[in-house]
Amino acid sequence: MSEALLEVQPDLHLVLRCHPGQLEFAGNYLRRFLARVELTPFVSQFQIAFDEANWCIDNALTRQSVLRWIAELSQTAVGEQARLPAGIRAVISDIVPEAFAVAKQAGLPGIGVSNYTWYEVAAGFCGPGEIEPLRTMYEQADLLLNYELSTGAAIPIRSKIPAGLICRPFNDSRIAEIRIRYKQPERPLIFLSVGGALSLERIGLCEDFDYLYTRGINPPAGIT
């Protein structure tokens, strides 16, 4: 989305806040536009605790983490408000709630881009009253560009526009280069990529295929 906005709006400048681990990728991906992009780190404190021994979510620890995160949201929003540069015309978030409180306080449009919010996730661990501050923060958003396969009516953002399926443009020459370098005769080549991290160590992948995967994915033993 950032790339598309920069393509169609040659006078547009973006302040892009993302996890420190994504800054290098964002800089490389948007390198054609770096004169108009400011990259700064932001870490959301929402954490799902994982019990690696039993290969499941630790519900009790996750609940504690969610409640602690919600208790700190207002203060986090105050800090983000102080960092808001002059001249900003809109705040777009995927899909941290603090962004909408900041936009509301500044009198700016607050736009979400996602197919869920952390409110629905938190509802799986906490009661409605406990996560009401989270609902209230999301309700300050003006609009959600709602991807396919969304959590629908459970999303506490009132105004939604269906956004359909979205992907980056295909680079046919780059795909051809990858096939020449990695594709083996009679063996399908599968590309795996996620927005964050994903462990596949206990999930069976067909050994008759070859896999390319992005940083953050841990493949099963025997898959390189």
Predicted regions and their residues:
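Structural motif
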Residues: 89-90, 143, 189
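Active-site-proximal region of nucleotide-activated glycan assembly enzymes
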Residues: 109-170
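Short internal beta-strands
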Residues: 13-21, 144-147, 211-216
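Conserved nucleotide-sugar phosphate-binding/catalytic loop shared by glycosyltransferases and other
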Residues: 6-70
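An aromatic- and histidine-rich active-site surface loop
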Residues: 24-25, 91-105
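Conserved nucleotide-sugar donor-binding subdomain of glycosyltransferases
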Residues: 52-90, 97
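Histidine-anchored nucleotide/phosphate-binding helix
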Residues: 1-8, 103
